[in-house]
């Protein structure tokens, strides 16, 4: 299970660009900037409880499971929001097991496994990767890559009263412009974006999180009574930011490489019953892109691809003849579940969407041959080495 952390406070602190972009007052959070909120912890415990009930109902674990050493693994990026997410989930899933959360970096530092950084970079690679990113804008490339966000930008500006903000009036912030986006790719750094998309993403992120956290939806939108479709429109800027930076084939194969290796190792680990890896939306998005996931839609979600607290679940099943099959699902809580904090009864599932992958065939039960699924993960991890080998060659742009 590859998880995105649950609800957190916005990444920016008081006095930041986020504050300067609106004359309105953001809500008071129950946690410090970037940290898991109390609501996020409660929701994550519920996700753990659902997982426990589901596994028990399938006969995969006994009630009040206390796993022997090596049977389960909880590994999180060393940020507060990811460690806390893993801790709350483990409390819900294994309430009497007192699970330790494994980290491999100093506290509050990014673990290389969960850091979506380009660890191989060359002039030829950057040129090819930027060409793929620009292709998201169609024939005109990077100039129009954000053209589809015009309505999202306009709604964000209206909701936060952007032109009445301190930053806009002082000239520090400019009107959101869909044509000023620039992407940079550097060695051992995360892909970065400059221009209006960065500002729009920060505002969309804070607004959507505030919508999840605040009791009153109108207050969350600074007095605007927004429809579900309008909240989705706001989220488009944030969602596209993740797509733009992390899901182009050459970029996904690069930034997801260490996590794909980790997932493969967990699936091969002898005796492992359950693994929980906790990271970020960029991790889930880049892994799905590297695995060549087909397009999908998420019912009852504001965020279109990797909603808060979502889990990418890799499952292995066997029939009476010992044949093994695989299934991959994206598990997430609906907007109502996030906002209301409601626990679903019994083994009723949160929202669940089955993933499909290009070039792989499902059987009549909607399952893949396990060997085919495992081979796809191995092939996606190996794509990194192929990119390195093809560096400088004409076919680099087709390597991924």
Predicted regions and their residues:
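Signature for phosphate-centric chemistry
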Residues: 1-71, 77-275, 279-400
